[in-house]
Amino acid sequence: KPVFNKEISSEVNVKAIFLNYVNAIGGIDVLNKVKSITTNASVKIPNAPFSPKAEIKQKHPNLNSLVMTVEGMGTLMSQKFDGENGYTEQMGQKIPFEKDQINSEKEKLGLFEEIYLDSSKMEIISLNQIEGKDLYKIKINETTFRYYDAKTYLLIMKEETSSQAGNEIKSITKYSNYKQIGGVLLAHKREVVSGPQTIVFKITSIKLNEEIDDSFFK
């Protein structure tokens, strides 16, 4: 039977957990050399009659793009952020990012956030067993929590609350199947849980340091 709220050693703090995570996935020297990440995935959407493909491109410090396509149907949706502004496009309709969305993207200062996040402003909330693993729950800010494995220090889960059209929406992203790519340990499975729906990204390839022009993110 899982024990909830296990005692946390006084030697453990957010800074130490972030450092252990950075070391676990490759170390700061290796991570600082990564200037872009291109991820391809097959996507499972519940009850959808098709399985989209996703291409995610990230470029240092915070440029990112997600494009989902379906064979024979073209682009299902795309979301882009160019460092200043962003938008989501779906069914030919372009919705610009709201101010808080832009600010939260701008706050990202690199591809591996744990390197530069100010741990002194964050706190460990608990050490609990979730799905058989002991996880440290860290409060990043009022709307974001992250869960790290107490044994491997890998990031297992992220919990975020955002407001869309006046409604609060909570989404959980689970990370698993970590594999090494170019000296960096990266999750090859992501599950995004939003409301009753779980979308599964099964990652088929990851490329580091591909040349990507800034204009791609516009």
Task: Give the positions of each predicted feature.
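A generic beta-sheet turn/junction motif
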Residues: N47, K59-H60, V70-G74, E131, ...
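Short, surface-exposed linear segments at secondary-structure transitions and domain or protein termini
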Residues: P61-L66, Y87-Q90, K106-G110, Q180-G183, ...
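Gly/Pro-enriched, hydrophobic low-complexity segments
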Residues: D134-K218
